[in-house]
């Protein structure tokens, strides 16, 4: 067993930026470019918080996933940039423009998108009037021209200012706000806005974390800011921007005191807009900003209902670890598990190389049903949330990989199977199938032409293939492995989980990466993760956890 005392999760040394804008509102870098910049800056995560818009989130997430797929395993699991769905809602409070940042809301909900679209249309109507008013006085501008210069963006006053600067009508962007379109300027037209209370309630309705942005930018004074926080806290405000690009050390300290006073989550960000805010950098603001990852971890724990930063999470293999020789759980083990979860408020994850449908059946048969319980199947390729009854993470082998694996298995005289839903799928069932299904109670679909048309036989790309040889695994499996690795170099994870089983998994699918992902997802420091296992496929999990426990009955590599 390894002690967690000296364990350090590198994620917690990295900064985050939870307030960032792209070209989908008034920033000058695309969502894809922001992902690259965040990686170059060494950020663990950033929140895309465009004004009244969710249009850039999918692009940023796709860019982040694509970057991870082309990184090494270690880079993908430890330093891949996480993109957080965010938004910045403009509201009106006592004649002032107050901004509410929302994180982790359900941006795919049609009702959410419809409401945000209405916010956007109100902004469009206001901007059209402002541009028309300027044009009437001879200023060379039209809303259509600004829109053409910012394709796909939600147009803000910053876009209008940038257009006037780029067309050489004004000498600086600041001039536009001080003389033309600032709140007290002749061409400013206010727009109908929702109240900050309604913005907070709106975000909470869709599962979001509402945060008061840059609290000292509104110049409310101490009493005024206190009153605003009281009103917003009453309707569900969850956070306040403690770290901000313009905050002095004293203001940061003051904001942290307010967070503690009102039991709010501290957040922080640069409010990066690219060249629209000269000198302001992503992640570091004007040079002194550092938003610690621990703040994001706290926000994640709040979202998932995790009590605090001391909560522990136990990842446990079943076969040869949690389970007895009769594939059950002993009374003493069950009592210890109950105490760990119910008595101390910790979390449990049943982690197995088995197919997810079988892991679910196993948990049901064993009557394992704890609050905040998760299942990890296919050696970590799939994660399942038991409370929400849904899969939220899945990595797969391509149909091309599956087709090649089946063809090579036939060439080498090896039995191979894959999985589709709750079924084992193979071309020809035999003694290996019978051996496997002694304990894994899944239906078998045979005579399936997986090696010819996997895209027809299978309903979706699978998480895993399994080669079984009961006679001469040391002689027959290595040549097969060599051929498969030559066909897909560095694209699969091939591992002998026992003397007879060769696991064929997606390249990043290991129990260790699953542990890392789930801890990151929940906001739990890996020093608080415990893992127990007995086989080679458990080793990455034991190495990734703060405390790794190798079973005495296990193979030497699991010690």
Question: Across the structure, where does each feature detected by a protein language model lie?
Answer:
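An N-terminally biased module of ancient metal coordination in phosphate/nucleic-acid-related enzymes
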Residues: 1-96, 181-182, 194-202, 206-277, ...
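Substrate-recognition/cap helix-loop segment adjacent to the acidic, metal-dependent catalytic center
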Residues: 223-236, 354-374, 475-493
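Mg2+-dependent phosphoryl-transfer enzymes with acidic/Ser/Thr/Gly-rich catalytic loops
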Residues: 305-313, 330, 502-559
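Conserved acidic, metal-coordinating active-site core of Asp-based
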Residues: 150-215, 408, 412-415, 419-530, ...
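Extended substrate/RNA-proximal surfaces in nucleic-acid metabolism proteins
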Residues: 2, 65-70, 74-230, 290-291, ...
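Active-site phosphate-binding/coordination module
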Residues: 84, 88-121, 331-436
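Structural recognition of alpha->loop->beta junctions
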Residues: 228-241, 282-305, 366-382, 443-444
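Non-catalytic pre-domain segments flanking phosphatase-related domains
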Residues: 1-8, 304-316, 335
